[in-house]
Amino acid sequence: MQGTKNNIYTVSRLNGEVRQILEGQLGKIWLNGEISNFSSPSSGHWYLTLKDHSSQIRCAMFKGRNQTVSFKPINGQQVLVKGAISVYEPRGDYQLLIESMLPAGDGLLAQQFDALKMKLAAEGLFAADTKRPLPKNIQRIGVITSPTGAAIRDVLHVLARRDPSIEVIIYPTQVQGETAAQSICQAINIANQRLEVDVLLLTRGGGSLEDLWCFNSEALAHTIYNSALPVVSAVGHEVDTTISDYVADIRAPTPSAGAELLSQDSDNKAQKLATALSRLQQSAKHYQLKQERRLSLLEHRLQRQDPKRTLQQFEQRFDEMQLRLESALLNRLHILSRRQQLLASRLEQQSPKHKLTIEGNRLSYLASRLQDALQDKLSQSEQRIKYAAHQLETVSPLATLSRGYSITTDIHNQVVDSADKLTIGDSLQTRLRHGQVISTVTQIKPLE
């Protein structure tokens, strides 16, 4: 008896331990049953009883949870609910706290969805490190959808508004029904065989869970995962989530959002043109400064070398640099001109003609100024070279001969600068401006 008395429970303790046991062991469960005694007081909470042919359980679904239910429950309706067992200790009643509620048919699909989601996650199909980035410059989009649905109209409308230069290739497929998943897989495989697009957009409009069920196919999940092309999933409305959303590289909430994700605003492309012009100016300026430094260095070297040979070499290098500079400038201008023409073609449907005209005139003006500046600089450099060559020629021995002087050497080619070094009979060579004179010493006279 003593041991029994030591284990006497209070009512509160009993209800508390029962609550811990039930909540700890059962956790969250799915429960199928028929609604009865449904009530919705002003607090916004729902209270009901779920029953089958022989038993029943009280349930509660609080306001924050029941706002996500897409239908109004009624007595006699079969539903599938997900929740956790809890004990209401003041009365000793146990009840089910409902977190989500679906009609019985949709509830079975939801269970299958959760099971497949857990399986694919365990296989690594949802891992973040497997997601492929979108191409930076998307030129062609492959759209996998029904060619007659609302989704393709929304996608084409958004692309035409934001970036009409993007090409669209439609891979027609079923998007609802028993064979839809297989049809979508075939479309993805065809796109990967052709490799004619930069990215795939898998899309359709909204619908019920059953309508969108083909996008919860395990085979489709593996096809998306194995695709060599990046895949964007834009299925249903923002509240709809499918297995394809988890496997795809990027998920968009709606077809229109998917099209916006894959396109760029035309104003951004105009900004890129302005950036390209600025880079061209900086590159030309840098190249000009570099050539000026090279010219200065060559001038310095020229002063320490033979004038004619150095001048010839420098003139040749100057011509080469001029040709290379002009070629580089023309290539830059040609590339920029082609970019401008391409952007003008893409933007033509939106008629930004005024902006393109301004940018084109600005480009021509800058190119003209750059060409004039380079030509002026080259002319100045050429004048400095000619002046330096003239200065060197003025101090050249050859220039001295042209003024009537001569240079006399002996038979050993040594310069004779004094009569004291000569004897009668020595042979001499005298270099004049034009030619040489060979002579023999017959008489030596000292200066008086």
Curated annotation (Swiss-Prot):
It comes from the Bacteria. GO terms for cellular component: cytoplasm; exodeoxyribonuclease VII complex. One of its GO terms (biological process) is DNA catabolic process. Keywords: Cytoplasm, Exonuclease, Hydrolase, Nuclease. It is found in: Cytoplasm. It catalyses: Exonucleolytic cleavage in either 5'- to 3'- or 3'- to 5'-direction to yield nucleoside 5'-phosphates. Heterooligomer composed of large and small subunits. This is Exodeoxyribonuclease 7 large subunit. The gene is xseA.
